[in-house]
């Protein structure tokens, strides 16, 4: 990373980068943050520093969390307020524009055909996709949802866990960790369920029925925070 930062004119991020934020760069380098979401349901970045599920305040300062950005891409004017808080920047660095992930969402890549060819046993059911955000209670919450679908005929629950959480194990259900991306699974799904994940905004682009499963809303609000 250090070599490419030293030899590049532009660096584009979709997450926090230690090398970008901690190092001093040449003045000609432009750093663009295009966060990996189309919105901000939950508090994140600097918004969540010091909370139970956020970063430690001393560590975030020592690691210069979200420093050195020249521009922050925001998908809407309403989201801009939360992005300024999360990235510690003012309005002069915010650029309102559509994000590349929207093009990915709208691109037809035959995901359904490929998925059902590989998983023919799922082709006759309505697919309900559960996309939880990362939190320590993931497995417990997923088990609750499993109970809700236990006696529902004609629907198959697919659980796609957050990339940071790999401990979800749901017996007799289809816990997915294969080669299809989250967007592929969203294209396949008939119904999408989430909680505090920004995938809710992606689901709205797909025009799919969307439900929020938030049995821990009060606890999560106090531990992490909701925008």
Regions found by a protein language model. Give the residues of each.
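Active-site and donor-binding regions of nucleotide-sugar-utilizing enzymes
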Residues: 1-106
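Structural alpha-helical scaffold elements that stabilize or flank donor/cofactor-binding regions
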Residues: 3-4, 24, 65, 121, ...
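Catalytic binding pocket for nucleotide-activated donors in carbohydrate/polymer assembly enzymes
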Residues: 171, 198-227
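Short aromatic-enriched loop/helix-cap "lid" or pocket-rim segments at secondary-structure transitions
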Residues: 43-47, 107-109, 169-172, 222-225
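Donor nucleotide-activated moiety binding/catalytic core segment of transferases
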Residues: 2-5, 10, 163-201, 205-206
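Conserved catalytic-core segment of nucleotide-activated headgroup transferases in glycan assembly
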Residues: 86, 94-171
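Short, polar loop motifs at secondary-structure junctions
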Residues: 15-19, 77, 161-167, 197
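Redox-cofactor binding/interface segments in oxidoreductases and associated redox assembly factors
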Residues: 12-13, 33, 74, 130, ...
């Amino acid at each position: 990373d250090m070599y490419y930062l030293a030899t590049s004119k532009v660096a584009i991020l979709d997450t926090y980068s230690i090398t970008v934020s901690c190092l001093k760069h040449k003045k000609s380098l432009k750093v663009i943050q295009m966060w990996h979401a189309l919105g901000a349901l939950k508090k994140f970045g600097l918004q969540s520093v010091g909370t139970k599920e956020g970063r430690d305040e001393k560590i975030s300062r020592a690691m210069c969390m979200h420093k050195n950005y020249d521009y922050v891409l925001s998908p809407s004017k309403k989201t801009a307020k939360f992005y300024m808080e999360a990235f510690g920047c003012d309005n002069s660095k915010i650029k309102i524009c559509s994000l590349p992930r929207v093009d990915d969402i709208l691109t037809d890549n035959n995901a359904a055909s490929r998925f059902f060819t590989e998983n023919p046993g799922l082709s006759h059911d309505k697919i309900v996709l559960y996309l939880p955000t990362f939190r320590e209670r993931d497995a417990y919450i997923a088990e609750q949802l499993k109970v809700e679908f236990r006696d529902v005929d004609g629907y198959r629950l697919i659980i796609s866990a957050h990339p940071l959480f790999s401990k979800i194990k749901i017996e007799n259900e289809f816990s997915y960790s294969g080669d299809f991306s989250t967007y592929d699974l969203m294209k396949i799904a008939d119904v999408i369920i989430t909680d505090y994940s920004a995938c809710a905004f992606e689901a709205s682009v797909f025009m799919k029925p969307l439900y929020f499963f938030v049995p821990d809303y009060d606890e999560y609000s106090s531990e992490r925070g909701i925008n």
